[in-house]
Amino acid sequence: MFSNLLFVPEEISLPDIPFQRFATLTGAFYPGYSSSTFTSHCSALQIDASLRPRRMSMGERKKAYIAFALACNADILLLDEPTNGLDIPSKTTLRRLLAAYADEKRTILISTHQVREVENLIDNIIILDEQGLALAATTEELTRSLTFGSLSPAAKAIYCESSLTGEEGIAVNT
């Protein structure tokens, strides 16, 4: 069961061994793990997997762990704030790798405050608040039922904030 599930936390904490060694040892628990895919993803993300985590920046550790996670070929991939700590080119590469990874047999669950960085990858949106589930809808349903941008005074705003050009926010599409 757990060999079909992989979690990538926001902050990566790893043993102080070369990342390639970590990937080899931990990859053994995932039947779909591919060392060649790991190497390819490390190359795409410009990561030197021979380094130990303490010699890597936060963003480098995250990229290495994401390369490992994708190489495990798990059916369910949970990503917590996957773009935090990544530079712009790495975010672009991450989106490309996730798009290639996604298929009908796999589920990718992304927890993020930076929706714009992954919006092209999203099929369904779940929004949680203090009370629990605030919204669950497909992107298509949201596009049909909501409008985003400048709001008129008559608009029934779901969310609104002041900007230099007036009120910006989300309203029910009428």
Regions found by a protein language model. Name each.
Residues S3, F7-A64:
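ABC-family P-loop ATPase nucleotide-binding domains
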Residues L77-E81:
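Catalytic Walker B motif of ABC-type/P-loop ATPase nucleotide-binding domains
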Residues R106-Q114:
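Conserved H-loop
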